[in-house]
Amino acid sequence: MQPQELKTIMGSGLLSFPLTDFDSEGHFNARGYAERLEWLAPYGASALFAAGGTGEFFSLTADEYPAIIETAVQTCRGKVPIIAGAGGPTRFAIQCAQAAEKAGAHGILLLPHYLTEAGQEGLAAHVEAVCKSVKFGVIVYNRGQSRFTPETLARLAERNANLVGFKDGVGDIELMNSIYMKMGDRFAYLGGLPTAEVYAAAYKALGTPVYSSAVFNFIPKTAMDFYHAVANDDQATQHRLLRSFFMPYLALRNRMPGYAVSIVKAGAKIVGHDAGPVRAPLTDLKADEMAALKALIDQLGPQ
């Protein structure tokens, strides 16, 4: 896929990050992962991110990563595009990006580098090294210690034609507005704060009409209903779902650092699509939290 095709896909509808399936001993479960993708594919996401943040990229080994991307590409070929997560140290990010390209992914989401802080010059060098290592499209993720200024993004865009997307996980409205005003349609933009539905209407007003949904992993129909409500400026439906599900869900998610991933795996287990346990240092939800989440899911009706 050409980079501009990835850009078009990014702007065409709801995106999501499938969970990565692990067995009871914590090993990658390829069969379970393929079955998950087969279940989710028909619901209408414009693309799925394999081995993204919700897919616990941070816990994957260099051997597991290619197997996950290959499984996703083979399972979803002809059904839904696969964008691979890639990140960490520059050389490892390049290794992941090249493995994803070889496997047939449609592009990568460049996740934040690991641990160390860096200035804009260093961040730019990191992104450019990854962009230069592949031919397909790259989406840069503005999150954590990887925070980019409009000027840095403009320089990167000028030097790297395959840098076609910008995902924001910071939530700095002034910065987001500045980036959009400077870059315009050079990038496709994606809302990427945890539980992105809560911020979707505000981001749409900033020129970012699409986002990635984590809850699509266990309530895909509701996730699509909410996305269509945002797209159609249906505030009544948005407010109903925010009040009845998303705000109580947010309160439950915020009980523990790392629950942004754990609660999604819990939801998948509740609806009969168990992806196994989360990997340390994440922890699974407690029994009372599982019960509270089940009550929230049950009142939404069939998916």
Swiss-Prot record:
Assigned EC number: 4.2.1.41
- Which leading EC class covers this enzyme? lyase
| Species | Paracidovorax citrulli (strain AAC00-1) (Acidovorax citrulli)
Q: Which InterPro entries match?
A: Aldolase_TIM (IPR013785), DapA-like (IPR002220), Dehydro-deoxyglucarate_dehyd (IPR017655)
Q: Which Pfam families match?
A: DHDPS
Q: What is this protein called?
A: Probable 5-dehydro-4-deoxyglucarate dehydratase
Q: Which HAMAP family match?
A: KDGDH
**SS bond partners:** none
Q: So what family is this one in?
A: Belongs to the DapA family.
**Taxonomy, superkingdom:** Bacteria
Q: Which UniProt keywords apply?
A: Lyase
Q: Could you tell me which NCBIfam families the record lists for this protein?
A: KdgD (TIGR03249), PRK03620.1 (NF002958)
MF terms (GO), sorted A to Z: 4-hydroxy-tetrahydrodipicolinate synthase activity; 5-dehydro-4-deoxyglucarate dehydratase activity
Q: In which pathway does it act?
A: Carbohydrate acid metabolism; D-glucarate degradation; 2,5-dioxopentanoate from D-glucarate: step 2/2
Q: Is this entry keyworded Hydrolase?
A: no
Q: Name one GO biological process term.
A: D-glucarate catabolic process
Catalytic activity from the UniProt record: 5-dehydro-4-deoxy-D-glucarate + H(+) = 2,5-dioxopentanoate + CO2 + H2O
